[in-house]
Amino acid sequence: MRRDRVNSGGSVGGWFEPPQYVNRGVEVTVTGSPTPFATGNYVGYTFTGNGDLIVSGGTLRGVEYIIVGGGGGGGACNGSTDAGAGGGAGGVVRNTDYSTIELQPKTYSVVVGAGGAGSTTNTLKGSNGSNSFLSSIIAIGGGGGGSENSAVRDGADGGSGGGGGVNGNSAGSGGIATTPAQGNNGGAGASAGSAGGGGGFTSAGQNGSTTKSGDGGAGFTTTFDTTSRSIGGGGAGGIYSGDSAGTATDGGGGVTAAADGSNGTANTGGGGGGGSGISGGFTRNGGNGGSGLVMVRWPL
């Protein structure tokens, strides 16, 4: 267990600190193995695994957070005219653009959602990512990407939706992002074309086309905990034979012709890339989604 006692006056690093944000005498302890950080007049923790945040000695004021769910797994395929879709990014909830919150003295559970497994068969979609949460504040896991089989071709709904898969002249639709919005919809697959990209926090997954697979939706970059992190990107859609590859950013998994999709990056909530078609009946798997993240900070 780690302890941090907050005990400051009204001025930190030359910046005047409003009295309502002074956390004098409040003690914060943690379990698990979060990484502590300090930035400006803020301190906090980055959780890449489960733990607890324990507040004692008074109300912790001015709390900000970014919570990212696990990314969805990519879809699979097993033919040269088929393509699995990209997984959707894990949902993102944050209050850095809005009002801060207060945490009363008690123990707050922190759970970091696992990324969803990429599909290893054309009869199953990629799995949805798991939810991340700080107490009752929940970021929904990303939707799995659709695979080639007709029953599982549509992308799954989630924090951001998974993309739609393709089987020859039949294509699936993109999954829908959760409401209230924590991300964007997945892109649709293209008939006689490539699969759709998974949705990202900032933009929707791109639809596949007859020349190119769908790009994963964009996430965003933040230095909330002093480390520059690119998070919340959707996975790229798998490639129909002869098409060019879509791209993925911000932790989403990419794709390569006639190959398994790439995994989303750990602790970004990135969606997994879709499997790309190959002749001979060989299955090309979807990439796994990236695990989520919980970051929390407060003024001294």
Description of each model-found segment:
Residues 2-300:
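Low-complexity, glycine/proline-biased repetitive segments and flexible coils/loops
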